[in-house]
UniProtKB/Swiss-Prot annotation:
Belongs to the glycosyltransferase 2 family. InterPro entries: Glyco_trans_2-like, Nucleotide-diphossugar_trans. Keywords: Cell inner membrane, Cell membrane, Exopolysaccharide synthesis, Glycosyltransferase, Membrane, Plasmid, Transferase. Disulfide bonds: none annotated. This is Succinoglycan biosynthesis protein ExoM. GO terms for molecular function: glycosyltransferase activity. It is a peripheral membrane protein. It comes from Rhizobium meliloti (strain 1021). Pfam families: Glycos_transf_2. It is an enzyme of class 2 (transferase).
Amino acid sequence: MPNETLHIDIGVCTYRRPELAETLRSLAAMNVPERARLRVIVADNDAEPSARALVEGLRPEMPFDILYVHCPHSNISIARNCCLDNSTGDFLAFLDDDETVSGDWLTRLLETARTTGAAAVLGPVRAHYGPTAPRWMRSGDFHSTLPVWAKGEIRTGYTCNALLRRDAASLLGRRFKLSLGKSGGEDTDFFTGMHCAGGTIAFSPEAWVHEPVPENRASLAWLAKRRFRSGQTHGRLLAEKAHGLRQAWNIALAGAKSGFCATAAVLCFPSAARRNRFALRAVLHAGVISGLLGLKEIEQYGAREVTSA
């Protein structure tokens, strides 16, 4: 086993993003793990095969194979499932199409997978802010991504920096829900289901990827929309397991948390970073209530996100 060649696929879902070129170039420049054979799967989610020319133009620069797959309909779950369906490797990594990887990114993810035996490994995402980003956003680092621990374990995850062990029992046949492909939250749902099926999720703290924060995302309004949608996903997952009095309790608890955080935001008014962090938590818990009540989820993928997706 240690001396066998590992086959690793890297899935990149894309939708009209020229930044994909830098993502692919960063993969070409990274250190390849020992005894590993790599392949990149680019899943183009645009109605037209708009990324094909970019991928074909970069193909001569790539030290490993690229599989371009056109999977239209502007539904991110279709693109993610396309990567799953076309993966033949021992592992499948996921990366966003506006990110660049550090030199040892894949090596670190693979080391953690080997030492922990986890079904999935997550890495951190470091946000890079432009000069027009508010000071509170930079100081509070509101856009970087890390996993969340609950009672000492990671119970859900994200696809912006992840490695999946394809033969893990908790992942066999698992797919991203098409119903969440425009609203988002499909990755939270995917990893939550994997964890509930017995799959463990590990964290590789040195497996860094880097993500620029475009100007249209460097606002409190954009973050609030994102947090509300995240809350909706969490509320929907809670609603699937709770009914009657338990459902009422969850709604009351989310309301209390939202109220507490809103009050804390007012009390922290002099500190913009603390004030906005509490305000965003209040919005998240309001989203949980929305999800518990089954209200329509915000759409964040597809034509409405052309300039920022």
